[in-house]
From Swiss-Prot:
Organism superkingdom: Bacteria
Species name: Mycoplasma pneumoniae (strain ATCC 29342 / M129 / Subtype 1)
Name this polypeptide is given: Uncharacterized protein MG373 homolog
Coiled coil: none
Amino acid sequence: MGFTKQYKIDFDIIDNQIVLSNNYFQKHKGSFRKITGTRFGKVIGISEYETSLKTWANMVKIYEDEFDETLSRAGQVIEPKIRDYVIAKTGFNFHSYDPKEVKWDLFPENPVFGGIPDGEPVDVYGKLAYDTNAPMLEIKTTSCDSLVYKKINGNLKIVFDENGMPIVKKINGKKDSWFDSNGKIVISPAYYCQIGLYLYLRNITKGMFAIAFLEPQDYVHPEWFEAKQRDIRLVPVQIDRKAFEVLTNKAQLWYNSFIRTGKSPQLTSQDWEWLRENGIA
C-alpha cells in the first residue's frame, strides 16, 4: 500500500524529520500502534534491513506495509502445521490465538508494548501453563535456498520463472546463513528480541524457536506441506529479565520521543532513499 496519508497535508519533512500535522496528530494519536515483537528490533536499531523510520511511519498510520502475498500465504497455511508438529514432538500443548478475537494484542493493559506470540503452553483446561516450565513458542519459516527478489515500492517480492516457481539464486544459500562454522543455529538479535519482548511481558524467561526450512514448491503449494518431510529445528532460548529490561527501556524512550511527539527519528541516507522510492521528497 505504501503511504496512505497526504504529504504536505498530514505530514511534512522539517529539519530532517517527518513531522505530523497538528490536526492529524490530535485526531489520530489515540489510535497509534504499539511496539510489537516484530517492531522491537527495528525500534532499538538492531535490524539488518531497515531503520526505525518505516516502523515509525507504520505506527503513526501514515504508511502501510506491502506484504509479499506468496510469503504471507505460505506462513498462514504452513505455520499451523509446524505448531502441530512441535506439539507432537515436545508434548507441550501450544495454543495459538485468532488475532481478530484478541484485537491483535494480548497485552492491552500495556500502553507501549503489545502483540501476539505464535504459541503459548496451556493445560487441559486451556489455562496458561508456564508454571510447568513449558516454553513460549515462536515459529519461523525460511527458504532453504536463496531466492531472487525484486524491490517494488521499497518492498521485496519473490520473482517466479515461466513455470510459476520461485527463481533460485543459490541452493541452500539461505539455510547456510542460519548456521555458524560449527553447524550450530544462530538466532539473529532481531528474532531473539521478538520472542524476548513477549517473554518479558509474560514475566517468564524460557522460549523455543521452531525454524522450518522450506523448499521452493512450498511457496507455490503450501497446502501440500508435510512437516515430517522438511528440516525443522527446535531451538531453546532464554532471557535474563534484568538485562532485557535495558532494551525495553531503550524502546520506551524511543516511543516517548517519537510516537508521543508525532516527530520521527532523524532521517538517514537510507531513509531518504526509501522516501524517494515511495514518491516522497
